[in-house]
Design a protein with these regions (language model features):
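Intrinsically disordered, low-complexity segments enriched in Ser/Pro/Gly/Ala and basic residues
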Residues: 33-35, 43, 172, 213, ...
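A broad helix-preferring feature
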Residues: 17-18, 28-31
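General helical structural elements
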Residues: 32-33, 45, 152, 250, ...
Length: 410
């Protein structure tokens, strides 16, 4: 049974966004050259090109991780990134063969999956290093890992100012091979704050410290790569591209607010539904739970089968709009679990079955568009939340991939 509310995912747009990001990086690299870190010779990976870690955690930001990962693999993503081992296993079972990095904390009970499914862990604490070392010894294998440095966000990672005390045993672990070092910015999307530059300084100092600790070739790969830039940092400052960047939101055609971008991107997802009922509301009557919308004149409403169980935020009422017949109409009344109502007064002949665009564009000649950034700004949140919250009962329908990229058609 097909529900009326559907998320349409354009894999060709996804692949085009990936290629546009790669072209942006290559063009800027050619113009500016590779940023260097004085004193970090052993940590400098190959200068060109900047590699891309495609972030597909959280079900590919709500877009459907299996199909998205296959599409990104087909156009040459160097690495895919998941939040945990469980997410990565889903991708492997879907046929994804590209290297997969686990960003988040590791569960000891899941560590066998690193070896069974050829995954790359992040090590962010001495305890994590000991656990992975023990698991690797049990499997009689050496495993490559990425080392996370906490440069001020105070979440996961080895503190940048305490590395000589905390890292020695990790770097000496016989079954662990250091492949990359990374950090994460707390304020990359806040251009007015100086903390971004402080974190960059802390990270580059940490790279020098680790270099001075003599990470030898027996414990490291041929190049110890560096990465720090998420989508916002990629747009903000080419000095933090280092050897790899980690676009997430940009891949899905959304620019992190309040930043702007010269990269030509296309939103990958649209969210549509259908009118299921049209109601006449008399003056003085209310609409929805709590009767929070009260008509002060004759009003016509349309009922849409999408509610908070589908990821529609309660705050959209009175703040956001949808598109019907190429026109914006406001959401009114409290959003229900399975439904919401919109005011279609003055819109002629609205009928059950009419298309409703919640996110996306509608119209031919004078088309209108509502995107995740607009919706997020209206309710005081971030576009990440808008797309990530689209519920599991909403079917994802996939459009094709770029010509020749048949792998992602599975």
């Amino acid at each position: 049974m097909i529900r009326s509310t559907v998320a349409h995912v354009d894999l060709a747009a996804l692949q085009a966004n990936f290629k546009a990001i790669r072209e942006f990086l290559e063009t800027r690299r050619t113009q500016q050259g590779s940023p260097s870190v004085p004193g970090a010779r052993a940590l400098s990976g190959p200068p060109n090109p900047t590699r891309i870690i495609a972030v597909v955690k959280a079900n590919a930001y709500g877009h459907g991780a299996e199909r998205v990962a296959l599409a990104l693999e087909a156009v040459g993503a160097d690495l895919l990134a998941c939040a945990d081992i469980e997410e990565a296993v889903v991708l492997r079972r879907a046929g994804v063969r590209a290297p997969i990095l686990i960003f988040g904390a590791l569960s000891v009970s899941d560590l066998d999956g690193l070896f069974e499914f050829a995954l790359t862990p992040t090590i962010s604490s001495p305890a994590a290093a000991r656990a992975v070392q023990a698991a690797a010894a049990k499997h009689a294998k050496t495993i490559g890992y990425h080392l996370k440095i906490d440069t001020g966000m105070n979440r996961l990672g080895f503190r940048h100012d305490n590395l000589r005390r905390t890292l020695s045993d990790v770097l000496a672990s016989s079954h662990l091979r250091l492949e990359a070092i990374f950090t994460h910015f707390a304020t990359a999307d806040e251009p007015e704050t100086p903390f971004f530059d402080l974190q960059r300084t802390n990270f580059e100092a940490a790279l020098k410290t680790i270099d001075a600790m003599s990470v030898g070739p027996a414990k490291a790969g041929p190049h110890i790569l560096r990465h720090a830039a998420n989508s916002a940092a990629t747009l903000r400052d080419s000095r933090v591209w280092y050897d790899m960047v980690r676009p997430g939101l940009l891949l899905y055609g959304i620019v992190p607010p309040p930043l702007a971008s010269t990269i030509r991107l296309t939103p990958v997802m649209s969210l549509t539904s259908r009118v299921v009922a049209v109601k006449g509301v008399r003056p003085g009557e209310g609409v929805g739970y709590g009767l929070r919308f009260e008509a002060d004149k004759p009003v016509t409403t349309a009922v849409i089968p999408a509610g908070y169980a589908d990821g529609i935020d309660l705050r959209v009422s009175g703040r956001c709009q949808v598109l019907i017949r190429g026109r914006r109409v406001p959401i009114v009344g409290a959003v229900s679990m399975d439904m919401m109502m919109v005011d279609v007064t003055g819109l002629e002949d609205v009928s059950p079955g009419d298309e409703v665009v919640i996110i996306g564009r509608q119209g031919s000649e004078s088309w209108q568009q509502i995107d995740a950034r607009e919706m997020a700004a209206a309710i005081g949140t971030i576009p990440y939340e808008i797309v990530c919250r689209i519920g599991s009962r909403i079917e994802r329908q996939y459009a094709g991939t770029s010509q020749g990229d048949t792998e992602a058609q599975r």
